[in-house]
Structures are given as C-alpha cells and as structure tokens.
Amino acid sequence: MWIGIISLFPEMFRAITDYGVTGRAVKNGLLSIQSWSPRDFTHDRHRIVDDRPYGGGPGMLMMVQPLRDAIHAAKAAAGEGAKVIYLSPQGRKLDQAGVSELATNQKLILVCGRYEGIDERVIQTEIDEEWSIGDYVLSGGELPAMTLIDSVSRFIPGVLGHEASATEDSFAEGLLDCPHYTRPEVLEGMEVPPVLLSGNHAEIRRWRLKQSLGRTWLRRPELLENLALTEEQARLLAEFKTEHAQQQHKHDGMA
C-alpha cells in the first residue's frame, strides 16, 4: 500500500515509519509512505502557510495555494487511483468497518489540516472523502492520520505476524475483545481461567466468544444493536448474562 501525507509537520510520521508494526511494514516494503509539506510550496521568503478567514473571527486557515500545490504534487506522485482523504471532525467517524473499507485502496493521500481548517473550496475540488476519529478537537490532522494508517495497515497481507490477527482484532466482528492472560498462572491470588489452560481449542474458542459478547454488552451495548447475532452468539450472551447476575448477587451478599 502507498500512502501520501500532506502535513506541515511531516516529521511527526516517524512514529509510523520507524516503530512497531507499521515500521516493520515500511522496512519490509509492504507499506510506502511519502510526505509533502505545504511550506515547501510557498512563494514568499517567510514561507507563510496560514491566512485570515473571510468574515473575521478567531484563528486562521491554511493558505489555499501552498496546500493545493502540495496536494497536486502528491496526486502526481501517486498516479491514477489515489483516494484523497481530509481528516476532519466533520467527517465520517472511523470504525472497524470503515477501516476495512479503506484498506481495499492501494493508494491513499491523507490531508492533515491545521489552524481552524482549510478552505471549503479545497474540500470541494480536491478531497474525495472526509474522515474523523471522534467527536473532539485536536490541534491538527496528524494524529488522526497516524491512527488511520496504523489501523488500515493491519489489513495489508504480511504485515501482521499471524494471518488471523486482523480478523480476530477487537471490533473485527463488531464486538469488543475478550480478556487475555499470560504468565504467571496466579497473580496476587487471581488465577487464569482454567479453560485457557485446558488445551481444548473448541472450549477456548467458545469461552472467548462468550467473554467478547459479554464485555460488549457491559461496556458498549449499543454495538450489539447493529449486529444480527447467530444462534450460538445469542445463547452464549444469555449464558454470560445469567452468570454475571449470579456473580453480582453473590457480591452484593458479601457486601
């Protein structure tokens, strides 16, 4: 996968290119990241990249000419078929389904805004899609862009060590992840669930699915509203609810 970055702070993306899963993907040639700074496309000696908004008000906008020229340079480098994305609080909220959808693209250009944003006409003429990582304000689009790159790159064949890792990730099936355990078997009196030590892969799979369903029901119940549960999932969720109620009753009795 090829990803182009439009950012006033391209050095921030060393966190993606030099470290972790994405760093290995870049090193192994599975992920290619190039960046363009609008500051390199300015025509004045001060390399100004912000401008006042029409109508007044606080803050500045990114200057149109350097930004557009940077986008055009990225498009030229990408060639045909690159989707241009603007990271914006007004965009579609990124979720696992969206990540999976974006991962089908071989080329992405990510535009990172700064200041109060960018001219609406640039969005209309240069941007294919707007995406948001949540309903809150950040200082720029770099962190959302890195979030998008990290999540999308997990779907690139060969990036993850285990072929099933991406499909078994939290949210991959619309559910939260199940609890995980490693050594020691007993930590401050708390034991690893015996089923995970049993070697019975069918029972382990069943336990993990039940815990995933239950954790989603407890923490993010709205996610279940969008799912059509299978017969097995519905049965396991009912079991979890019964067990949870029994545990709560026992806890209340001890209080």
UniProtKB/Swiss-Prot annotation:
InterPro entries per UniProt: Alpha/beta_knot_MTases, tRNA_m1G_MeTrfase_C_sf, tRNA_m1G_MeTrfase_TrmD, tRNA_m1G_MTases_N, tRNA_MeTrfase_TRMD/TRM10
Naturally occurring in which organism (per UniProt): Escherichia coli O81 (strain ED1a)
Pfam families referenced in this protein's UniProt entry, alphabetically: tRNA_m1G_MT
Function: Specifically methylates guanosine-37 in various tRNAs.
The organism's taxonomic lineage, starting at the top: Bacteria, Pseudomonadati, Pseudomonadota, Gammaproteobacteria, Enterobacterales
Gene Ontology MF terms in the entry: tRNA (guanine(37)-N1)-methyltransferase activity
Keyword annotations from UniProtKB, A to Z: Cytoplasm, Methyltransferase, S-adenosyl-L-methionine, Transferase, tRNA processing
Protein name: tRNA (guanine-N(1)-)-methyltransferase
Residues the record lists as binding S-adenosyl-L-methionine: G113, I133, G134, D135, Y136, V137, L138
Catalysis: reaction(s): guanosine(37) in tRNA + S-adenosyl-L-methionine = N(1)-methylguanosine(37) in tRNA + S-adenosyl-L-homocysteine + H(+)
Annotated family: Belongs to the RNA methyltransferase TrmD family.
Major location category of this protein: cytoplasm
Claim: Cytoplasm is one of the keywords in the record: yes
Intrachain disulfide bonds: none
One annotated GO biological process: tRNA N1-guanine methylation
Localisation per UniProt entry: Cytoplasm
Sections of the chain in a coiled coil: none
Domain of life: Bacteria
The keyword Transferase belongs to this UniProt entry's keyword annotation: yes
Assembly and oligomerization: Homodimer.
EC number in record: 2.1.1.228
Record's GO cellular component terms: cytosol
